[in-house]
């Protein structure tokens, strides 16, 4: 949900829920046997944000400066590996993201963008146990700062069809990269 104002300021919010599937096969060694697990975890979340789109250069080109608060909850999960019972605690994630995105219109069908953001995770801790006993596994924590760089494109194939490509790199508390390809049909 997004509301754009004439001065370029916008507010946005979203709700989401789903199921996260995690499968690990033939990795955990139990005696002479390779075993694994398969778990499904319910999650839900929300975000609120505010930003300002500032026109620049050619018509349609802009800089989007924004701030977002993102909340996500992952349910706890119990599973068994080779007779051993494991419990993963629920996780609460609260993040603040401040960033910018530069949008450039290439032609009437193609828009490119790139940007950067700083994100701070306020928590994201997880505790685990085996057969009812707390275990010290240096419980993972995502608390801390991450810098995110992104690049992407939006191609409008027709009035109804469009394709989005996106790539992101993460440095700091979270490290790695992600990408997505999305086809959109508008009614």
Which residues are covered by each model-predicted region?
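Membrane translocator/pore-forming domains, dominated by Gram-negative outer-membrane beta-barrels
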Residues: 1-187
